[in-house]
Amino acid sequence: MTSPSSRTPRGSTPPFEPSADELVLHASGRKTAEDRLPGDPSPAALIDRFLRVDQAGEHGAVRIYQGQLAVLGRRSANVGVLRHMLAQEEVHLATFDKLVADRRARPTLLGPLWHVAGFALGAGTALLGEKAAMACTTAIEEAIDGHYKDQYDRLGDDELPLKATIDTFRREELEHRDIGYANGARQAPAFPVLSGAIKAGAKLAIWVSERV
């Protein structure tokens, strides 16, 4: 049975906005891409790339949890945590949808692919069992952790709202990782192989979505 939470219409979730106090915490005295080398993207091009890939990634994450809930539905002992993680990912996606529109960034051309692939990954791992679904979560979130950390480190004080947003979302992704491990991810069948394959796929999707 499909969870009602898995059918939340895109665009109905309010985006996240960091508070003034949060902005102060992330000041570094640096500017975005101030140490870039010849041939590196300009600050504007870098932000365009960041927003494109982050929107794509959060779209994929929403679809993964929707796929897992479509398979596991109400019979899963983890349905509550799946809904919690989905709700947070929906806020992440709503935020990047707004940022892409406000800053006129170019969305990835591969959105339809990630829409299908994310759901398929979520449903496929759920069909392998609840622990495999949690292994999917830990693998994805570990890939996203490194991705968001790299973005955070490259943003300066001229992009404090985006920097604070990425830090907040990164901490929530790490929470999802910890939830996955606490709910048996390591006990999934062939965990090292499954986790490694999903991480590799996530990193490839990040690389492609930045560029296409």
Curated annotation (Swiss-Prot):
Fe cation 1 binds at E58, E89, H92, E173. Its EC number is 1.14.99.60. It comes from the Bacteria. GO terms for biological process: ubiquinone biosynthetic process. One of its GO terms (cellular component) is plasma membrane. Its cofactor is Fe cation. Binds 2 iron ions per subunit. It catalyses: a 5-methoxy-2-methyl-3-(all-trans-polyprenyl)benzene-1,4-diol + AH2 + O2 = a 3-demethylubiquinol + A + H2O. The keyword Ligase does not apply. It is an enzyme of class 1 (oxidoreductase). Catalyzes the hydroxylation of 2-nonaprenyl-3-methyl-6-methoxy-1,4-benzoquinol during ubiquinone biosynthesis. Belongs to the COQ7 family. This is 3-demethoxyubiquinol 3-hydroxylase. It comes from Rhodospirillum rubrum (strain ATCC 11170 / ATH 1.1.1 / DSM 467 / LMG 4362 / NCIMB 8255 / S1). The lineage of its organism: Bacteria, Pseudomonadati, Pseudomonadota, Alphaproteobacteria, Rhodospirillales. The gene is coq7.
